[in-house]
């Protein structure tokens, strides 16, 4: 009697309309789904595809963009092992502690996070929006 975990969208308790974190589960992937709302800096879609599926060859266009504010948004995708996410609200209080298993992904749009590795030899892919301009301009630590 396995309980299937589903996608979680975690909103701020301080600003209830502000989406802070998304947890996407391997079991959530059916067809194409845009996981992160399009107004965010980081983008992710999941695609479940059958053999012989193809896409038209293409390249992406360079754009000249100027933003008033830009934040580094980050994602972890668990390839092997298990990871506990500790997710923070915008006031630095812990808001959720989901467990990621193989094929699951976390997305931090706003708020903070840390991770606890629960199994030896855990492997993750980490994705962040760039460009990276050094730790001083990228993050502040939560006490």
Enumerate the predicted regions with their spans.
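Conserved short histidine dyad/triad with adjacent acidic residue
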Residues: 47-70
